[in-house]
Amino acid sequence: MFLAAAAFLLSAPASASQGDKEPVYRDCVKHCVRANCTGARLRGFQSTQPPYMALTGWTCRDDCRYQCMWTTVGLYQAEGYSIPQFHGKWPFARFLCFEEPASALASLLNGLACLLMLLRYRSAVPCQSPMYHTITAFSLVSLNAWFWSTVFHTRDTYLTEKMDYFCASAVILYSIYLCCVRTLGLRRPAISSMVGVLLILAFTSHVSYLTFVSFDYGYNMAANASIGIINLLWWLCWCWLNRRILPYWWRCGMVVLLLHGLALLELLDFPPLFWVLDAHAVWHLSTVPVHFLFYSFLIDDSLHLLNTEKPGVKLD
């Protein structure tokens, strides 16, 4: 429902942080680039760089920034100061080409869980079920978002950051459409069609503003959070109204409450344990099991709709 979406509502990286503002860090980067990233030294770096690093776009300057980050962290620790952030992020120990190994792994696990449960849904629910195609499309949108989340946590670039944020917004907006179809659209298809058009226009405007006007992290977070709250209240209202009719309603309510409760983990925002596991990674990891509960609800609900879709029978 909101699995891919909820994982992005609170995070809003800054363009500059305490660590990368430090003169020692900036001087280190300048010296490293001058000494290693020109002429024969640059060719030497490129010839010895592992293929997986080159394929993921790691440059000599990027490597200088990485090495100087740890030099600065070491100085902070030696003086007894708290660990600073660099370019809006905590310092992470790189593993192979993965900038944030734990978050990348967690995003991959979420994607695999989503794929596994989509396949289970398609094998358990006939395509004649009223929600079949809407749920399948939502799952594909979610899979795309988890793919780009994995890519972004593997390698943070201008493109991967934008795709991560835009695809997360797509999931949030599509989750509104999914909610609308399930609660209103089955009896009044015109309403869901109208809402679908409005959501497409909203997504187009949102992406256009962030791309061509200003990539405003605060605006992006506020917009996504607002839609997420609407989604939360809409689903909880539906669950409450159907609690005596649908025996599986609690699964939907549990998923909604779990996701928004688990999102509070992001507020902890501590330096990564062992330079790998931070609050964001813990948050991502905690959402993996929720896919199974969510799709259990979707399967039961889709089968219920299939069995009650008869002339004169009201769809809940």
Curated annotation (Swiss-Prot):
UniProt keyword terms in alphabetical order: Glycoprotein, Golgi apparatus, GPI-anchor biosynthesis, Hydrolase, Membrane, Signal, Transmembrane, Transmembrane helix
Protein's UniProt keywords contain Glycoprotein: yes
GO molecular function annotation: hydrolase activity, acting on ester bonds
Residue numbers on the Cytoplasmic membrane side: 119-131, 187-194, 242-254, 300-316
EC number: 3.1.1.-
InterPro entries: Per1-like (IPR007217)
Annotated GO biological process: brain morphogenesis; GPI anchor biosynthetic process; GPI anchor metabolic process
Known glycosylation sites: 36
Signal peptide: 1-19
Subcellular location: Golgi apparatus membrane
Gene Ontology cellular component annotations, sorted alphabetically: endoplasmic reticulum membrane; Golgi membrane
Transmembrane segment boundaries: 98-118, 132-152, 166-186, 195-215, 221-241, 255-275, 279-299
Annotated membrane topology: Multi-pass membrane protein
Similarity-based family: Belongs to the PGAP3 family.
Protein function: Involved in the fatty acid remodeling steps of GPI-anchor maturation where the unsaturated acyl chain at sn-2 of inositol phosphate is replaced by a saturated stearoyl chain. May catalyze the first step of the fatty acid remodeling, by removing the unsaturated acyl chain at sn-2 of inositol phosphate, generating a lyso-GPI intermediate. The fatty acid remodeling steps is critical for the integration of GPI-APs into lipid rafts.
Protein name: GPI-specific phospholipase A2-like PGAP3
